[in-house]
From Swiss-Prot:
Residues 1-88 form the PTS EIIB type-1 domain. InterPro entries: Glu_permease_IIB, PTrfase_EIIB_Cys, PTS_EIIC, PTS_EIIC_1, PTS_IIB_1, PTS_IIBC_treh, PTS_maltose/Glc_sub_IIC, PTS_Sugar-Specific_Components. Its EC number is 2.7.1.201. It comes from Bacillus subtilis (strain 168). The lineage of its organism: Bacteria, Bacillati, Bacillota, Bacilli, Bacillales. Induction: Induced by trehalose-6-phosphate. Repressed by TreR. GO terms for biological process: phosphoenolpyruvate-dependent sugar phosphotransferase system; trehalose transport. This is PTS system trehalose-specific EIIBC component.
Length: 470
């Protein structure tokens, strides 16, 4: 524990001293600081500390990569050393917002909404992958699936499919819970709002197109005003805007309603007003906007698939550095909920992560420092499993050329899989296990993309380092 105390003291000194720390907390792998002045950080000193695997600044926070299992111990020593008191993640986020511009605040808001629901979505993606293995034809048998050859497996596959599909079927409820909580309202009302938007009495959003063509869209007649009885399954924008409205109405009413009757007044009025607004105004408008955006994106990638894959696949790692990659989860979910039924963006995310891992692994055979060798190995494996921060910030950005070579490689792989029309039926673990989220008919093309990002970044990084050394 003496070494950890020493490391904590060194970290405090490197980030500008205790007086420069407005708040501090930690996540699974990183210390998160809200610093008063980031220009006071001594980067060179920080990089020399044994427990530090990397550092970066994003969304108004200065984050120091320590590693799972060690970070909580270092944080405990840091609290003792500085006397700042333990801060919650929310407190650090609030303190860090002072350092953000409007765009960063918007990106952070989306990240705060979608990151908490990621475990449910990723789990659903993995289970859908298992269902794909059981039901897809031509994987283990030339023209049949496992359930066709072994019918006794059919009900098991059906149960897995039901469990996997639940998160996407009730996606507005998940988003409603997280969004209302983020906007300062009661998250339970957010769940009710989300479930309301996918109520079984409503026309399923996926059947809207056919119903519109046949002229059979059911409506409510509110004193002459016809309101379509349409659900918003798989939609992101309606629940986001409705959640914001719900939270603001609830906060407004709570401040102005006597405490004794809040239970009878606040929630009923809040849900009624938000519900009417959702079905009459918010839902139809955002549904149309969402369709225009997804149709436009699909059209662009349909016409310029290779170019789109090259750019998105190549620059995704750069988005990770800025923190803007979180915004694309909403786009992925919107694409999955569209007529396309899948996302062409998420497969490139998985390949980008693998590329950064391959470049980091190559550095293990290049660097002389034993600490960096160990970090290159562990961070490379971590990136293969979908966690790229140690590889990007601890290894690749430190030497620059591995990061650039990985970007070029993932751009090439993205160009290839986009030209092949590869789609993921869900989002999952963004690394090697990501293949299970890919629609089975595209496994071959995705495997070639994986081969590119496994081989090219490793070989390119190794060759460049040797050539540069000579």
């Amino acid at each position: 524990m003496g070494e950890l105390n020493k490391s904590a003291r060194q970290i405090v000194e490197a980030v500008g001293g205790a007086e420069n720390i407005a708040a501090a907390t930690h996540c699974v792998t990183r210390l998160r600081f809200a610093l008063i002045d980031e220009s006071k950080v001594d980067q060179e000193m920080l990089d020399q500390i044994d427990v530090v695997k990397g550092s970066f600044s994003t969304n108004g926070q200065f984050q120091v990569v320590i590693g799972q299992g060690t970070v909580n111990k270092v944080y405990a020593e840091l609290v003792k050393e500085t006397g700042i008191g333990e801060s919650t993640k929310d407190e650090v986020k609030k303190a860090s917002e002072k350092n953000m511009n409007p765009l960063q605040r918007a990106v952070k808001t989306l990240a705060d909404i979608f990151i908490p629901i990621l475990p449910a979505i990723v789990t659903a993606g993995l289970l859908m992958g298992i269902n794909n293995i059981l039901t897809a034809e031509g994987i283990f048998f030339s023209t049949k699936s496992i359930v066709q050859v072994y019918p006794q497996w059919a009900d098991l596959a059906n149960m897995i499919n039901l469990i996997a599909g639940t998160a996407f079927t009730f996606l507005p409820a998940l988003i409603g819970w997280s969004a209302v909580k983020r906007f300062g309202g009661n998250p339970l009302l957010g769940i009710v709002l989300g479930v309301m938007l996918v109520h079984p009495d409503l026309l399923n959003a996926w059947g809207y197109g056919a119903a519109e063509q046949s002229g059979e869209i059911p409506v409510w007649n509110l004193f002459g005003l016809e309101v379509q009885k349409v659900g918003y399954q798989g939609q992101v924008l309606p629940i986001l805007l409705a959640s914001y409205m719900l939270a603001k109405i609830e906060v407004f009413l709570t401040k102005r309603t006597p405490e004794g009757i809040q239970l009878l007044v606040v929630a009923p009025i809040t849900l009624l007003l938000t519900g009417f607004a959702s079905f009459i105004i918010i839902g139809p408008i955002t549904f149309a906007i969402g369709n225009v955006l997804t149709s436009g994106l699909i059209s662009v990638f349909g016409s310029f698939a290779a170019l789109g894959g090259l750019l998105y696949g190549g620059f995704y790692s750069a988005l990770v550095i800025t923190g803007m990659h979180h915004t694309f989860l909403a786009v992925d979910l919107q694409l999955i909920g569209s007529k396309l039924g899948g996302t062409f963006l998420w497969p490139m995310l998985a390949l980008s992560n693998i590329a950064q891992g391959s470049a980091a692994l190559a550095m293990m055979f290049i660097v002389k420092d034993e600490k960096q060798k160990g970090l290159s190995l562990t961070s490379g494996i971590s990136a293969y499993l979908g966690i790229t921060e140690p590889a990007i910030f601890g290894v690749n950005l430190r030497y620059r050329f591995p990061f650039i070579i990985a970007m070029v490689s993932s751009g090439l792989a993205g160009m290839y899989i986009s030209s092949q029309g590869v789609l993921a039926s869900s989002v999952g673990v963004g690394g090697v296990p990501g293949i299970f989220s890919i629609m089975s008919q595209y496994w071959g093309a995705f495997a070639i993309g994986m081969a590119i990002v496994l081989i090219v970044p490793f070989a390119g990084t190794y060759a460049y380092a040797r050539f540069k050394h000579k």
